[in-house]
Amino acid sequence: MDETIENCASLCTVSCTGIDARVGGIVGLVDYNSRTLIIRDCYNIGKITGRSDNGSGDAGGICGFYMNGKISNCYNVGEITGSGYVSKIAVSAYNDSRPTNCYYLSDTDTDLNGTAKTAAEFANGDVLEELKAGQR
């Protein structure tokens, strides 16, 4: 049986420091021992920071790190930093489980786990229309 998180928002600063730290706006870690976690129709506008002495410190706007999950129809406009892998949407262990229909505010970084959109595209409703089209 799958577990689902939907229609959630993160508007705050989230920071995690420690060995193998993994932090996200909605979820920090979904590992292969857990049930499949479905995250949909969620967003983050807060600052997410992951730091680790051993170099992991993974950080994602929606999910810090996932191996057994499905992420769809989400967006991030918050700042994401970390000492390990960093993703505007989610750090994924497997290429075949990339998030779908997810967007992030474009800057100088590119992210394979989402689609970059400009501030104008967020403001004029383009992103909203794409998210609405992706709902069930």
Report residues per predicted region.
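Predominantly extracellular beta-rich ligand-binding scaffolds that present long acidic/polar faces
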Residues: M1-R136
